[in-house]
Amino acid sequence: MDADKIVFKVNNQVVSLKPEIIVDQYEYKYPAIKDLKKPCITLGKAPDLNKAYKSVLSGMSAAKLNPDDVCSYLAAAMQFFEGTCPEDWTSYGIVIARKGDKITPGSLVEIKRTDVEGNWALTGGMELTRDPTVPEHASLVGLLLSLYRLSKISGQNTGNYKTNIADRIEQIFETAPFVKIVEHHTLMTTHKMCANWSTIPNFRFLAGTYDMFFSRIEHLYSAIRVGTVVTAYEDCSGLVSFTGFIKQINLTAREAILYFFHKNFEEEIRRMFEPGQETAVPHSYFIHFRSLGLSGKSPYSSNAVGHVFNLIHFVGCYMGQVRSLNATVIAACAPHEMSVLGGYLGEEFFGKGTFERRFFRDEKELQEYEAAELTKTDVALADDGTVNSDDEDYFSGETRSPEAVYTRIMMNGGRLKRSHIRRYVSVSSNHQARPNSFAEFLNKTYSSDS
């Protein structure tokens, strides 16, 4: 008997077949750099910076920007942002810089140039006759890179969210050390003309390079990061959610994973912690791997680790977190089962804490406290033979060990308790639910049961 086959009849004929479906249609690519070469792009011929500034500024004023010219200018303008490397900087075996080296964003990557001249048209007419200053270059670079952030804001955000962000960004680049170079509201007008710029690989690469530089190097113009910060951990919402989750419940990654009672987590946990990736290395290329073109399909996105993502946000919903209530459910990753486990874990870590005295008036008081605690522990461990102390753990309700939580779920037949459902309904019904969000899912699924 083949365990994978099913047998049935069609027109009195016995049919035996193996029902097979595509389980994972995506080929995930890990970002680790194997050839010890810095990430690289190729651009046109390096421009005269004064000419390039005037051309790009004029294009911005007329809301007609040429992406190739913008990328060429952004790469050339990196020379204005020199800083000192605070420590030896290596990633995936590549020496980016040594402590004390003078570096610019261009030191982090390789930018090859061809002999192809840029366009450098003066679309908006000739307004600036003198050569631009460094603060003016910095302001233009900041505004251009902000187009990246604006084009990453999805249509799901309601109201004037995007306009407000654009407004705040413009205010930054009108204030010292920057200088006002365009009329207010130009940024939003320009963005509408190039709303999909986050999909242009070279523009994305340069935004990530600037962000990686300013996130480590202290610099007068570090506020340029306001437009590029979205390149950090881009397409890593699964991994980022997990990191936030373990901080929120005050456990290590290892301790948290012991509560993941479902076979579908196995593949995702293996994927998320693939050896050789610098997931926990500060200032690694890993943080910007998506923008630097090191991976086409992120193994760390919410879709790649959908069960983990769903579970974490159901726990977040139980705890009343707005971010979780607004997040989008990964419908293909067992949301009903994840909501059950999320209810139990939410109950376990919500409104409870592990507290102990850690600070004392003097050493004597500390020693007395430790001695008293030791005695308490010895008494607790002395088994009087009436109860199996392991079982006591499971039924006392005082323990939050994985074994105890698992036992409680099994005792309830893998179903949510009434108290869990009431909690889910109360947090989701008081929230204006976005389409396909966790709040909407909980409302639709459990409101009739409450």
UniProtKB/Swiss-Prot annotation:
This is Nucleoprotein. Keywords: Capsid protein, Helical capsid protein, Host cytoplasm, Phosphoprotein, Ribonucleoprotein, RNA-binding, Superantigen, Viral nucleoprotein, Virion. The keyword Phosphoprotein applies. Belongs to the lyssavirus nucleocapsid protein family. Encapsidates the genome in a ratio of one protein N per nine ribonucleotides, protecting it from nucleases. If expressed without protein P it binds non-specifically RNA and therefore can bind it's own mRNA. Interaction with protein P abolishes any non-specific RNA binding, and prevents phosphorylation. The soluble N-P complex encapsidates specifically the genomic RNA, with protein N protecting the genome like a pearl necklace. The encapsidated genomic RNA is termed the nucleocapsid (NC) and serves as template for viral transcription and replication. GO terms for molecular function: RNA binding. Changing residue 389 to D: Decreases viral transcription and replication.
